[in-house]
Swiss-Prot record:
Gene giving rise to this polypeptide: cbpA
Source species: Shigella boydii serotype 18 (strain CDC 3083-94 / BS512)
Origin organism lineage: Bacteria, Pseudomonadati, Pseudomonadota, Gammaproteobacteria, Enterobacterales
PROSITE patterns: DNAJ_1 (PS00636), DNAJ_2 (PS50076)
Keyword annotations from UniProtKB, A to Z: Chaperone, Cytoplasm, DNA-binding
Compartments, as annotated in UniProt: Cytoplasm, Nucleoid
GO BP term, pick one: chaperone cofactor-dependent protein refolding
Name of the protein in its database record: Curved DNA-binding protein
Alphabetized InterPro entries for the sequence: DNA-bd_curved-DNA, DnaJ_C, DnaJ_domain, DnaJ_domain_CS, HSP40/DnaJ_pept-bd, J_dom_sf
Ranges where the J domain occurs: 5-69
Cited function: DNA-binding protein that preferentially recognizes a curved DNA sequence. It is probably a functional analog of DnaJ; displays overlapping activities with DnaJ, but functions under different conditions, probably acting as a molecular chaperone in an adaptive response to environmental stresses other than heat shock. Lacks autonomous chaperone activity; binds native substrates and targets them for recognition by DnaK. Its activity is inhibited by the binding of CbpM.
Amino acid sequence: MELKDYYAIMGVKPTDDLKTIKTAYRRLARKYHPDVSKEPDAEARFKEVAEAWEVLSDEQRRAEYDQMWQHRNDPQFNRQFHHGDGQSFNAEDFDDIFSSIFGQHARQSRQRPAARGHDIEIEVAVFLEETLTEHKRTISYNLPVYNAFGMIEQEIPKTLNVKIPAGVGNGQRIRLKGQGTPDENGGPNGDLWLVIHIAPHPLFDIVGQDLEIVVPVSPWEAALGAKVTVPTLKESILLTIPPGSQAGQRLRVKGKGLVSKKQTGDLYAVLKIVMPPKPDENTAALWQQLADAQSSFDPRKDWGKA
């Protein structure tokens, strides 16, 4: 009788978790299912995979199998386990063989741990303005239903009315327990995960909890200072442009950024100096007067300097 290497059959490692093993089982069950596979040994491989899954999916059976595998070269194990008849060990022999080798006291009453269905992820687009308050959203998705061989039998359309909390961030995951796929063996449903995607905004860029907005100003507003109206997520504010402001300068508006449970970010106004269109004769004369008055000013004097 031969003790099979169930981990090798499943293509996994002994250290892999149940989720990884279950994924491997589903993949192999689909690959070798006799109704699907064209390979000549598909039926035998399918039974072998099912046998491996029967043991490795049960927490206690897996622990007992690991113990048997660890002792497979021990003399006591060989005397009890190998009969020289060339037969292969299978999952049906498991209980009797384990008890004969390690004794009944080594076994404990066990129940197969409840498996659970697959989780589902759905990306949900949220506008920046919607992050300020809790709001309701209708979510529609297809719920896959798997058979015992890990293949999708059907997809059921499903619609939920969910609450999106205030202060959600890009990439945040919201769990809806039990709204995933049902387990094919009668275990609990998986979960539905809503993955938040903050939609691009035409005015604001997100930098952590802060927001940035480009504010166009005229050359004279930058030079002389001004007060300009700037939008925020909630309302418009009057922003003070200091005299002598430079292009690219960032002006902080405290508390006007993104809101979360932990903190409120700031809004940064990034100044962009916008030149007027091609000047007429009178405007050109005024620019010339300014150039003459500032003849000693060289905007490129610091080029190449650290």
